[in-house]
Amino acid sequence: MAEPQDMWRCQMVNCGYVYDPDRGDKRRKVPAGTKFEDLPEDWRCPVCGAGKKSFRRLSDEA
């Protein structure tokens, strides 16, 4: 599994989705091994539809 600094959590109030590069995003056809930074700019959270700007790196959370 990816290290926390490689995973990103959606910061929307009702979501909490975590993007894990080891898993990718099958719903949006993002292959496993795709870093968050390499996701297309129009990629959206598969749970709530939020854009990439709504995500924060897990290691940045206190």
From Swiss-Prot:
Which stretches make up the Rubredoxin-like domain? 7-58
Annotated binding of Fe cation, by residue: 10, 15, 45, 48
Superkingdom is: Bacteria
The keyword Acyltransferase is assigned to this record: no
UniProt keyword terms in alphabetical order:
Electron transport, Iron, Metal-binding, Transport
Q: What does this protein do?
A: Rubredoxin is a small nonheme, iron protein lacking acid-labile sulfide. Its single Fe, chelated to 4 Cys, functions as an electron acceptor and may also stabilize the conformation of the molecule.
- Any extra remark in the record? The midpoint reduction potential is 25 mV.
Question: Quaternary structure per UniProt?
Answer: Monomer.
Q: Which PANTHER family match?
A: RUBREDOXIN (PTHR47627), RUBREDOXIN-1-RELATED (PTHR47627:SF1)
Q: Under what name is this protein listed?
A: Rubredoxin-2
Q: Which organism is it from?
A: Desulfovibrio desulfuricans (strain ATCC 27774 / DSM 6949 / MB)
